[in-house]
């Protein structure tokens, strides 16, 4: 769904799926989540520095998310409520659930509603992009409709997103191996990395001092940032590989522009692992 509040664009920063799909149109999959940074009004005095973790600082961020929940008004949205299930421990990110009246048959594999993941993650460097949706792009060719696209929204650089996707895969793989859970919830990140590796600008970014610096800053100590040695990208264990391939296929309904096979994704990772 498009972000309609174009009048608020100086305060909006798109990242993650929102930036890759709706801003740069690199990936073609659905998501219930909208990853976005909305700058708090100065009057709220929300503390957003990464080292501001005192109880009063955390409370200021909680107050901001509560304010945002009460402030959001979007055509077609019937309710707006906090969803604390995805909240970061220190509330550097938090969930807001948007619900709407569904007029079509629900798609298997998609949760109802939209989860707005608001937070204060790094969103620079970025560039202005118009935010659209597959529904708008289709409908505008058929009938006259209101242009509800958000124009010139600052979208996070895809090269930096690649680093963060690699870290996400690594961390989620490690936790999945510890818990034994079925890994459906993060298989989409393998697809995202595959698509990012097709982009010339991302290819040019890999190996640069900025790329290496972002890896150093973003990977936790528990994860091996050397991709060619990290088991999350090798999947040499046959049972684990089969489990992941099955989980990837189980999410097929998410991909509206088709998708590569999981073997193709792993083959691409094998080609790039020495540079990543």
Residue ranges and their predicted role:
Residues 14-18:
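Glycine-rich beta-strand-to-loop/alpha-helix junction loops that act as flexible
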Residues 1-12, 22-29, 40-276:
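Structured mid-to-C-terminal alpha-helical surface segments
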């Amino acid at each position: 769904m498009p972000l309609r509040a174009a009048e608020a664009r100086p305060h909006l920063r798109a990242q993650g799926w929102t930036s890759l799909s709706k801003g740069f149109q690199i990936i073609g999959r659905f998501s219930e989540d909208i990853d976005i940074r909305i700058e708090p009004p100065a009057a709220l005095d929300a503390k957003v520095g990464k080292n501001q973790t005192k109880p009063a600082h955390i409370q200021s961020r909680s107050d901001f998310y509560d304010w945002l929940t009460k402030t959001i008004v979007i055509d077609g949205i019937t309710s707006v409520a906090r969803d604390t299930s995805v909240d970061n421990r220190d509330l550097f990110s938090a969930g807001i659930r948007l619900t709407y009246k569904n007029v079509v048959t629900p798609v298997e594999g998609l949760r109802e509603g939209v989860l707005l993941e608001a937070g204060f993650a790094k969103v620079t460097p970025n560039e202005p992009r118009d935010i659209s949706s597959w529904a708008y792009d289709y409908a505008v060719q058929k009938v006259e409709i209101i242009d509800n696209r958000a124009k010139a929204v600052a979208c996070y650089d895809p090269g930096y997103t690649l680093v963060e996707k690699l870290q996400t895969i690594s961390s989620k793989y490690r936790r999945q191996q510890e818990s034994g859970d079925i890994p459906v919830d993060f298989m989409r990140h393998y697809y995202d990395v595959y698509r990012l590796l097709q982009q010339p600008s991302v290819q040019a970014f890999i190996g640069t001092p900025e790329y290496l610096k972002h890896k150093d800053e973003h990977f936790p100590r528990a994860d091996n940032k050397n991709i060619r040695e990290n088991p999350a990208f090798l999947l040499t264990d046959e049972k684990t590989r089969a489990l992941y391939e099955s989980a990837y296929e189980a999410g097929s309904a998410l991909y509206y522009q088709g998708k590569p096979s999981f073997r193709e994704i792993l083959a691409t990772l094998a080609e790039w692992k020495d540079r990543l």
